[in-house]
Amino acid sequence: MKRWGLQAMAWLAAMVVSGHAVAAEERFDGVVTRITDGDTVWVRPDVTEGHGRRKPVKLRLVGLDAPERCQPHGSAAGAALAERVQDRRVTVRRRATDMHGRALGTLWLGEQDVGAWLVAEGHAWSARYGDNPGPYAGQERRARAAGRGLFSVPDPELPRDFRRRHGPCD
């Protein structure tokens, strides 16, 4: 637990140094209006939450990395996420905003962390930070052992390696 806390602090410090805006966690409820890919959704906040906005917020799920859309299993990851949350009421726990203006945080469907679900079902990897296997390492280990989703093939290529070899999807 102590190790994870130190590594989380290092991750937040890296975000500050890299130009990411970090603020206190903001929570809001809303409806998922669009799925960009296996780890990015658009959520329209509820007016009743006092935000005074109904413009959808682009949310990049933290703690995981889903395959690129043009990568093997990329379409399946996006489809699984859409089936799970599209047009559903969710809670966003926004931690920061990245340099592209995307909110960074977690998505909750009731009491379920959607990121944990994606990794457990084999639709994404637990995001690694240096030596830290990430917050969903246990879910990834079990998905690998069961051969779920992208782990049904030996040694699936990490998205960062795929991007390095092929560039971004068009």
Regions found by a protein language model. Name each.
Residues 22-129:
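Electropositive
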Residues 1-3:
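Positively charged n-region of N-terminal signal peptides that target proteins for export
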Residues 7-19:
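Bacterial N-terminal signal peptides
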Residues 130-170:
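N-terminal targeting pre-sequences for secretion and organelle import
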